[in-house]
């Protein structure tokens, strides 16, 4: 039995989908444990490109159980659309290979409308995807969310729960001169989608526990990245859930006593979608080259990702926060063109040096990166599958990051295809 939690150590888009797809070849189940359809995974298999938002990456492989845990906020329409899209490509999702937690809060039309309204009212936008994720999590915390299990209720009970939800939302809408939403409209939405969702619903905490008891291998697939975490990220430019490894235990109901490997993903450089601090950002030809070579467009938003040098301060802090035991580096090939490559090793502000990210947004806005410069390799690493065949300067770059982060790199991704992977150490898959 092996349990592996996969988390991003930057601002998301580290390539978790491809890596989980690769790992799931040796797994029995893959579990999503937080976020919603505001996160996107792009997976390339035999030149076919699949873009997933809610479904775990394992759905592309036969014989794997894919699970959505209770920590996910579930947009039922987005899920059904994703399932139908895969079906049109010959991939069938059934109750035998897919399960949804009965405790998932549902993202409804009222949440998406609230997301757009709140973003318009903010003085400084945070760059929300307008998918309704934040308002849904807010309703969950305030104990008024409609959950998947509520779809089993008699209609009159469901009506009462929706009425309670809308008593809050309609009050807000009234204050900004927006028309109220009728309870019956939301109830009808739910009744129409219920038959398509309920066949997949089960107590997934129990399902996962049974898999662990049977010594099965489970991958826990994180969404977004460490510095989008609601508690540990660059607040307020963050998502609405916890994105670090510990959320896996809460977001699907497993206990921390189970032996778990925690795999942290980093790009060989840094990217960010949307607003917020970005200490190594390159608004120049360097950033443009990274953007073009890395094809840096958001899977969900289709927005251009901002690009910059590798930030080892952030990555080291992320390693500590999640207790990372091994690293995966992705998109090494994007750096092939540079004659020299920089790594941010410290921040400075007013003659003070920081080896961590201060929580204060004000101080964050003043931080300047302190770089260490390494020679580039200017030789193609694209599609490489052998570590010893990498250019020596590429190996030196990898070793420098291992040295700073104090964690070994197990895998290196050198292209979008499933098998474009350098395996340095895969012992974690078997013990």
From Swiss-Prot:
GTP binds at residues 12-18, 40-42, 305, 331-333, 413-415. It is an enzyme of class 6 (ligase). Pathway: Purine metabolism; AMP biosynthesis via de novo pathway; AMP from IMP: step 1/2. SMART domains: Adenylsucc_synt. GO terms for biological process: 'de novo' AMP biosynthetic process; IMP metabolic process. Binds 1 Mg(2+) ion per subunit. The active site is at residues 13, 41. Pfam families: Adenylsucc_synt (PF00709). IMP binds at residues 13-16, 38-41, 129, 143, 224, 239, 303. It catalyses: IMP + L-aspartate + GTP = N(6)-(1,2-dicarboxyethyl)-AMP + GDP + phosphate + 2 H(+). It comes from the Bacteria. Its EC number is 6.3.4.4. Keywords: Cytoplasm, GTP-binding, Ligase, Magnesium, Metal-binding, Nucleotide-binding, Purine biosynthesis. SUPFAM superfamilies: P-loop containing nucleoside triphosphate hydrolases. Its cofactor is Mg(2+). Substrate binds at residues 299-305. Mg(2+) binds at residues 13, 40. It is found in: Cytoplasm. Plays an important role in the de novo pathway of purine nucleotide biosynthesis. Catalyzes the first committed step in the biosynthesis of AMP from IMP. Belongs to the adenylosuccinate synthetase family. PANTHER family: ADENYLOSUCCINATE SYNTHETASE. This is Adenylosuccinate synthetase. The lineage of its organism: Bacteria, Pseudomonadati, Pseudomonadota, Alphaproteobacteria, Rickettsiales. The gene is purA.
């Amino acid at each position: 039995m092996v349990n592996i939690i996969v988390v991003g150590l930057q601002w998301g888009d580290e390539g978790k989908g491809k890596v989980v797809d690769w790992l799931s070849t040796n797994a029995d189940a893959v579990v999503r444990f937080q976020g919603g359809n505001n996160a996107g995974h792009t997976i390339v298999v035999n030149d076919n490109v699949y873009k997933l938002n809610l479904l775990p990456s394992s759905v592309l492989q036969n014989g794997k159980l894919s699970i959505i845990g209770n920590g996910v906020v579930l947009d039922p329409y987005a899920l059904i659309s994703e399932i139908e899209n895969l079906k049109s490509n010959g991939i069938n999702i059934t109750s035998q290979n897919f399960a949804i937690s009965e405790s998932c809060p549902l993202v409804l039309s009222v949440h998406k409308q609230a997301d757009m309204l709140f973003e318009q009212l903010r003085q400084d936008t945070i760059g929300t995807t307008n998918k309704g994720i934040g308002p849904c999590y807010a309703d969950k915390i305030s104990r008024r969310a409609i959950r998947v299990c509520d779809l089993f209720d008699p209609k009159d009970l469901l009506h009462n729960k929706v009425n309670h939800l809308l008593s809050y939302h309609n009050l807000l809408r009234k204050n900004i001169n927006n028309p109220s939403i009728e309870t019956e409209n939301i109830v009808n939405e739910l009744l129409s989608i219920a038959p398509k969702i309920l066949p997949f619903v089960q107590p997934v905490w129990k399902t996962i526990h049974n898999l662990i008891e049977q010594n099965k291998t489970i991958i826990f697939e994180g969404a977004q990245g460490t510095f989008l975490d609601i508690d540990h990220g660059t607040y307020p430019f963050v998502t609405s859930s916890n994105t670090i490894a510990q959320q896996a235990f809460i977001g699907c109901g497993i206990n921390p006593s189970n032996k778990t490997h925690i795999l942290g993903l980093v790009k060989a450089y840094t990217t960010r979608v949307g607003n917020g601090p970005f200490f190594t950002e390159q608004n120049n030809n360097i950033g443009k080259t990274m953007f073009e070579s890395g094809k840096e467009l958001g899977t969900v938003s289709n927005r251009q990702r901002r690009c910059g040098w590798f930030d080892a301060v952030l990555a080291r802090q992320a390693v500590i926060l999640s207790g990372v035991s091994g690293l995966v580096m992705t998109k090494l090939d994007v750096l092939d063109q540079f004659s020299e490559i920089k790594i941010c090793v410290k921040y400075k502000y007013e003659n003070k040096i920081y080896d961590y990210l201060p929580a204060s947004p004000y101080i964050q806005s003043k931080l300047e990166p302190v770089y260490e410069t390494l020679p580039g390799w200017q030789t193609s690493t694209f599609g490489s599958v052998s570590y010893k065949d990498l250019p020596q300067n590429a190996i030196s770059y990898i070793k420098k990051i291992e040295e700073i982060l104090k964690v070994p790199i197990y895998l290196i991704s050198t292209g979008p295809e499933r098998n474009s992977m350098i395996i340095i150490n895969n012992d974690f898959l078997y013990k």
